[in-house]
């Protein structure tokens, strides 16, 4: 993991991108994925599955992550299942990936790490 890049991304805010803005080129996507190695390419976006100790832990985690997404005004597709929360990020206005996806992924991963500490692990 590129911790320096992850810290940089997590400290930034998602930008309001106008429709038709260009999506990221593959080399830039590969570089940014180094900051969030648990996230994988999936179609036009990136996705991650968080593993938890119970269904209710997943519900609590999703509430936390949803609040962060709302603050950033960048919202993932989400699926809450037994002991799992799966998120998919992509930027609709660019019809693909933007830096916003990696900014939010970095923030969500940091929140998950803190959540795990507060919940006593997954």
Report residues per predicted region:
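Charge-rich alpha-helical segments
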Residues: 1-122
